[in-house]
């Protein structure tokens, strides 16, 4: 755990050079959950060494799974029997990703409990999409005071209609269907990058899946999976977006290599309309043969506020996790930007923390905020918000703010971003770590 770790930033410096996009946090945690389906050895390649992954490794080890690092690869070997009673409750409550264990564990355990999950603190995040999706397969979920009780008498293939295009609910449904013999269909599924990643992994395990990249997935489930496999995790669009925002706000020319372009096209379109100058080249596929990559060459640009509200939508819309970056980008854009963060009850409230750096914001309600630019950002000491993306935009703002800033208790950033200090230093940022 890194609860007492801080970042100290001497801001106002230009960045330059090339940064490679890190591998996907959300893809990695989904595949850690999916690995429980396999009775054979799973090698996950290019796994980001981040706190969210560390927590899930602790959970896996606590229930008897052997997990070992080999450089940036994880070697995962299941036990003969899952010891769910010994689950590391502290680690499990640190991450909402634990919910995705339901779809895998139900094939080994007819009845079990999971601790209530945590992760980002963004208001109520209902498990109802999971409950309604999985009950079609014969899986019952009860939310108790401090844990979830999961049980099933008989698993059956099913047609599932998701009333909410949830990434994790889609993944849970995929994992549930994977080891139920027969054909299952998931309608109105998320097609986001971590869902496509999970589909690619399940295909490698021998599960037939049609419709990858669309909103209707057809799964040809198999009774048992026992294969020794290797699978490489793809690049993270939210990691690329962090460096796009950092380059824009510091007025820098930077290249982001191996960016997953299909999950950044709407973001780049908006930024282009705001005045960002950039070029794309070197198209290729990631090792999973699904994710399309390009290099993004950003130029220092003068931005104007986007004339319409900026809001996120399920893929192929602007990514929900990338929306917060537009708040800090708005501080350097000429004019007033309206951001509508409709997904979470209070994430927009965290955007007002930019005021500590000299931004001018007006919070209209818990979902809508106006940001006036350009602002002359100044150094400050800020306690890191407990939610990942709001925390990162404070860091981006501090990179541009002249003077010495301190961002305290940065665990929430290290949950999702790998080697962020070293990678920023490589681009010329003056940033160091310190402890309380």
What role is predicted for each listed range?
Residues 1-436:
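Short, structured segments at the rim of ligand-binding sites
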